[in-house]
Regions:
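Short alpha-helical scaffolding segments that buttress acidic/His motifs in well-ordered protein cores
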Residues: 36, 46, 50, 64-70, ...
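Secretory/endomembrane lumenal or extracellular ectodomains immediately following the signal peptide
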Residues: 1-61, 178-181
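Acidic/His metal-coordination segments adjacent to aromatic residues that form catalytic metal sites
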Residues: 101-110
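Acidic/histidine-rich alpha-helical segments that form the ligand environment
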Residues: 109-150
Length: 181
C-alpha cells in the first residue's frame, strides 16, 4: 500500500507524441501508462507485451490470475485498476474480490479457479512448480492455456514491481486495499 504523496517518476502530460496519442485513443491513459509515455520505446515495448486480448483463458481466469498476483505482490495500484475495470465484467462477487487479498486463499475457490490461485502462490513462493502439481494442472488446462498462465503471472509480477517501485498513486475511483484491523 503506497503512502507516497506523488509517484517517484512523474507521469507525462498531454500533448503526447503521435505514436502514444494513437494508443491512448484505444486505452485509458492510466498513471502507469503516462509514466511510461515519457519514453516512446519503453511505452511501446510495455504495451505491446500485454495479455488483455482474447487468449487461451476466460476473462474470469485471466482476471483471477492478475488479481491474485497483484495481491501477493502488494501492488495496490494494479490490483485496484483490475478490480475497477474488469472484476465485475469477469463476474466476481465482492467476497471473491476480497478473497484475492488473503494469502493462500485457494480453499475459497473451486475447480480451475483454485488451481489458478495455487499456481500463483507456488510461483510467488518458489518460482517453480512441483511435478505432481504440474500433472494436476495438465489435467485441467490445455498446454497453451498453461503457457499463457505462466506468461501472465510473469508479466504481472513485472507490472507489480514497476508500480510498487514507482510508488504509483491509485487511480481515481480504483478501490484500495482494506486497512489492517
Amino acid at each position: 500500500m503506497t503512502t507516497a504523496k506523488e509517484s517517484r517518476i512523474a507521469p507525462a502530460e498531454a500533448p503526447w507524441p503521435e505514436s502514444i496519442q494513437a494508443r491512448f485513443q484505444k486505452l485509458t491513459p492510466l498513471r502507469l501508462f503516462r509514466v511510461l509515455a515519457r519514453d516512446e520505446r519503453l511505452f511501446a515495448r510495455f504495451v505491446d507485451g500485454g495479455f488483455l486480448d482474447r487468449g487461451h483463458l476466460s476473462l474470469r481466469e485471466r482476471e483471477l490470475t492478475i488479481l491474485t498476483v497483484c495481491a501477493r505482490c502488494r501492488s495496490e495500484y494494479e490490483w485496484g485498476v483490475h478490480v475497477h475495470f474488469f472484476a465485475k465484467k469477469a463476474g466476481f462477487s465482492e467476497a471473491e474480490i476480497a478473497s484475492t487479498l488473503k494469502p493462500s486463499a485457494s480453499a475459497a475457490w473451486s475447480g480451475r479457479d483454485a488451481l489458478i490461485v495455487r499456481l500463483c502462490d507456488a510461483l510467488q513462493d518458489r518460482c517453480e512448480i512441483a511435478e505432481d502439481f504440474w500433472t494436476e494442472l495438465r489435467a485441467s488446462f490445455a498446454e497453451m492455456a498453461l503457457l499463457e498462465l505462466l506468461l501472465l503471472i510473469g508479466k504481472y509480477r513485472q507490472v507489480c514491481i514497476l508500480t510498487n517501485a514507482l510508488a504509483l498513486l491509485p487511480e481515481k475511483d480504483a478501490p484500495r486495499f482494506p486497512l489492517p484491523a
